Amino acid sequence: NLKRVTLELGGKSPCIVFADADLDNAVEFAHRGLFFHQGQCCVAASRLFVEESIYDEFVRRSVERAKKYVLGNPLTPGVSQGPQIDKEQYDKIIDLIESGKKEGAKLECGGGPWGNKGYFIQPTVFSNVTDEMRIAKEEIFGPVQQIMKFKSLDEVIKRANNTFYGLAAGVFTKDLDKAVTVSAALQAGTVWVNCYMANSVQCPFGGFKMSGNGRELGEYGLHEYTEVKTVTMKISKKNS
């Protein structure tokens, strides 16, 4: 019983912010790219690389943005974050947050449950995160932002690709040559430049490496529902 399947298996997507980027734009998109839907998003920008010269200011603004979140019933006007999907996922996120604290990441805000009822987790931001930490390697699927520092283009490309996953990525820069170079080098099925999660039904979507196989959407998505046939016919006499 051979099944043909298209698989989208999540990721640990890098988001790279260069010093020449529009900082306000980068902070906002990086924030939305992670905290959307309580962080329960397959393309979440869960490995945020920020160039060294703007790192401290980027962290400050990111923390300021995260602290503006209002938690509660997501159907209530004005609420920006609801609960996690279930207890199993809630426990996994809390465990990963605790691992970040123990492994030496700096907790900038959040870092635990919210309220006394339901599976709510405070919007959490870690700085001084290093690549070997669990929060930098494992898909958290929750409202936990990890901000890492880099010095050079070659370094950040190598670090961004050092993962089993390859679903999506983001690049923030005003330098077109840099944007093209990095986009081509990143091992990801989708790369957004100066934006994040800007999806279109015309664009194929899917992952590299352990993030899956096959594509959804666009012309490539239709190929998954078709069969290719070859017919070869021998003609006894040419007609012309």
Swiss-Prot record:
Its EC number is 1.2.1.3. Non-lens specific, predominant form expressed in the liver. GO terms for cellular component: cytoplasm. It catalyses: an aldehyde + NAD(+) + H2O = a carboxylate + NADH + 2 H(+). It is an enzyme of class 1 (oxidoreductase). The modification N6-acetyllysine is found at residues 106, 149, 151, 174. Keywords: Acetylation, Cytoplasm, NAD, Oxidoreductase. The keyword ATP-binding does not apply. Gene3D superfamilies: Aldehyde Dehydrogenase, Chain A, domain 1, Aldehyde Dehydrogenase, Chain A, domain 2. The active site is at 8, 42. The keyword Acetylation applies. One of its GO terms (biological process) is aldehyde catabolic process. GO terms for molecular function: aldehyde dehydrogenase (NAD+) activity. It holds the Pfam family Aldedh. Pathway: Alcohol metabolism; ethanol degradation; acetate from ethanol: step 2/2. SUPFAM superfamilies: ALDH-like. Its main location: cytoplasm. It is found in: Cytoplasm. Homotetramer. Belongs to the aldehyde dehydrogenase family. Elephant shrews, in contrast to other mammals, possess both a lens- and a non-lens specific class-1 aldehyde dehydrogenase. Can convert/oxidize retinaldehyde to retinoic acid. This is Aldehyde dehydrogenase, cytosolic 2. It comes from Macroscelides proboscideus (Short-eared elephant shrew).
